[in-house]
Amino acid sequence: GDIHGQYQDLLRLFEYGGYPPSANFLFLGDYVDRGKQSLETICLLLAYKIRYPSKIYLLRGNHEDAKINRIYGFYDECKRRFNVRLWKIFTDCFNCLPVAALIDDKILCMHGGLSPELDNLNQIREIQRPTEIPDSGLLCDLLWSDPDQKIEGWADSDRGISCTFGADKVAEFLDKNDLDLICRGHQVVEDGYEFFAKRRLVTIFSAPNYGGEFDNAGALLSVDESLVCSFEIMKPALASSSGHPLKKVPKMGKS
């Protein structure tokens, strides 16, 4: 799930799950922005990708987009610590990242969620890279959409971009494509993970005490050879280092 520049928590994740190459890792995007150490976070992940390419896989999140990370911290961190040229090099890198992964032909993983334009997995395979993230359409939705318990079908998103989808759309898509589970990030959830649509979709968020503001846990999803899923939970700190009280996470909060 999302890391958002929380480098120490990324190291904790590897402590829990094992450092590469002892385990295979799939990350769901949002490596940068908001946290203080986006550069360490993305550089460690890319270094592992270079060293153990078949052991670590990095999907693209909505923050791996120049329009977004120009605003939410990564650009400023690059400029302050190095230079704008470095940020532009990362932009070129992010434009090449894959946007979805399929585990054992049964578990579909992406950062955001489903799209009204998505009927089958070949549509994802046909997305050309490198690419920027458009403001609407399939690629946008894969990185930006959210599940919503209160609706059926599709609805506009409070984010002002992309859409939300109901449990009926999850069931419809999974049944049509012979899949078991959708695994996605993109929303801070109190326990680090949260199920939706009769456990046919799971949201995973891996940045505990997100941004130093929330009292959420972080989670790591483990999938064994039989596709049995289990969760490792990184408990949140009891108080924020800033001395301010931590906010409770709203159900399916935004990130």
From Swiss-Prot:
Cofactor note: Binds 2 manganese ions per subunit.
Keyword terms of this UniProt record: Hydrolase, Manganese, Metal-binding, Protein phosphatase
Reaction(s) catalysed by this chain's protein: O-phospho-L-seryl-[protein] + H2O = L-seryl-[protein] + phosphate; O-phospho-L-threonyl-[protein] + H2O = L-threonyl-[protein] + phosphate
Binding site for Mn(2+) 1: 2, 4, 30
Pfam families, alphabetized: Metallophos
This enzyme's EC code(s): 3.1.3.16
SMART domains xref list: PP2Ac (SM00156)
Lineage: superkingdom: Eukaryota
InterPro entries in the cross-refs: Calcineurin-like_PHP_ApaH, Metallo-depent_PP-like, PP1_catalytic_subunit, Ser/Thr-sp_prot-phosphatase
Active-site residues, record numbering mapped to chain: 63
Enzyme kind, highest EC tier: hydrolase
Keyword Metal-binding: yes
Cofactor: Mn(2+)
GO molecular function: metal ion binding; protein serine/threonine phosphatase activity
Binding annotation for Mn(2+) 2: 30, 62, 111, 186
Family: Belongs to the PPP phosphatase family. PP-1 subfamily.
Name of protein: Serine/threonine-protein phosphatase PP1
Biological source species: Brassica napus (Rape)
